[in-house]
Regions:
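Non-catalytic macromolecular-recognition regions in eukaryotic signaling proteins
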Residues: 1-18, 23-156
Length: 156
């Protein structure tokens, strides 16, 4: 069956890390949480499943599109590679197929030193972003798309 998701929350963790050259760099990590349901529980793959089946070679089951506010409107930002990827959904305890539901978190870091290089749409500070999220089950059924609340990164 096709998975269904709902927006749960979006939050930011601000931290400073070493740049490896004796300096410090600022990192804003954005954590997006979505609630999910899937009637047959075929979300998430084991390493063995990925290795055994070539159709999962470049499989992404958590897809994130980024929007930035410009002149009062949100416009898409192209990331290469795209945000998201292969997320480990919690497996059913008995490994038998069946309905599954829960909450999954996805975190992506924005490193201040490289931030403007991600996209020409980005500015130095105080960009307002939103994220559109969808998930894909192991049969390649694509969920509905949810949108996060806006969040400001590299805020003064």
């Amino acid at each position: 069956t096709t998975p269904v998701i709902q927006f749960n929350s979006v939050r930011k963790i601000v931290k400073t890390s070493s740049d490896g050259l004796g300096g410090k760099i600022k990192i804003d990590s954005v954590i997006m949480s979505v609630d999910f349901q899937d009637g047959d529980g075929d979300l998430g793959l084991t390493v063995a499943q990925i290795k055994a089946n070539p159709k999962y070679k470049d499989f992404s089951n958590f897809i994130v599109d980024v929007l930035i506010q410009k002149n009062g409107k949100f416009v898409p930002v192209t990331f290469s590679p795209r945000l998201g990827g292969l997320v480990n959904f919690p497996f059913l305890p008995n490994q038998k197929p069946g309905p599954i539901e829960g909450t999954i978190d996805y975190s992506t870091p924005f490193v201040y030193a490289f931030y403007k290089g991600y996209s020409p749409l980005f500015t130095e500070k105080n960009d307002t972003l939103k994220f559109q999220i969808k998930i894909v089950d192991n049969a390649f059924n694509v969920s509905n798309t949810v949108e996060t609340a806006p969040i400001i990164i590299f805020q003064d």
